[in-house]
Amino acid sequence: RPTAPCWQATHALLAHLSAAGFDGAPRVLAAGQATETLTYVPGRAAVPPLPEDTLTDAALVSVAELLRRYHSAAASFDPARFQWPRPIPARFRTGLVSHNDVHPANIVFRDGRAIALIDFDLAGPGSAAWDVAAAARYWAPLQDDQDIADSRQGRALERFRIFLHASGLSQAGRRRAAEAVVANHDWTYAIVTEMAAAGHQGFADHWREVAGPAARARRWCQRHQRDLLAAAE
């Protein structure tokens, strides 16, 4: 596949994860200025329509546990000597290299459990709380009920609480994740709209599809900010 602009940083991170014994990410087999070859991770990426076995509370907890293992392995990686892609807001950066794109399509499942993260192109200095906020937005999901058409409908706050408490974050970390939800939403969709405006057709098509639900999700998160913080306790 084509290499991303900050591929050297990404490859160093993946090599570190492998050396640390983390088996939940691909390994680099070959790389050049234009293309890279990574190992194939057997399983099924959680692409829409999401399979029923990825919608269970057990699957939700497995995503949180996968992130927890990733953050533990990444904690000893020093990002200082590399250039990284788009930075996250400074108030949510701790120095840990977070994945920053914990979209369902970037998580590989096997037998109803999350077993690997893929697509580290947006990875960069961030925090565990930032990743947890991002993952929870997608996996709770933190959306208006009219945009949830599966068994998760009506359970966003309950599932958010489950995810936070399975993430391994301290109480302060969980509160930080709750505080990061709207900022993470804005950061994510700024990338989409900027890429669409720059003429990338795939992003333009995606934005036309999600603009309405994204706006409703942001309003939902703002309206429920106190509830999100309460779930962190």
Per-segment meaning from a language model:
Residues 28, 88-134, 141:
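Active-site acidic catalytic loop and adjacent metal/ATP-binding pocket
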Residues 188-233:
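ATP/Mg2+ or Mg2+-diphosphate-binding catalytic cores
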Residues 49-84, 95-100, 105, 109-110, ...:
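Conserved kinase catalytic-core helix
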Residues 77, 116, 127, 142-146, ...:
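Short, structured loop/turn "capping" segments at alpha-beta junctions
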Residues 132-168, 184-195:
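Active-site activation/catalytic loop segments of kinase-like enzymes and analogous catalytic loops
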Residues 177-179:
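Eukaryotic Ser/Thr/Pro-rich intrinsically disordered, low-complexity regulatory regions
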Residues 1-73, 77:
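A conserved alpha-helical element in kinase catalytic cores
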Residues 49-54, 124-126, 143-148:
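Short, polar/flexible loop-turn hinges at active-site or ligand-entry regions and domain interfaces
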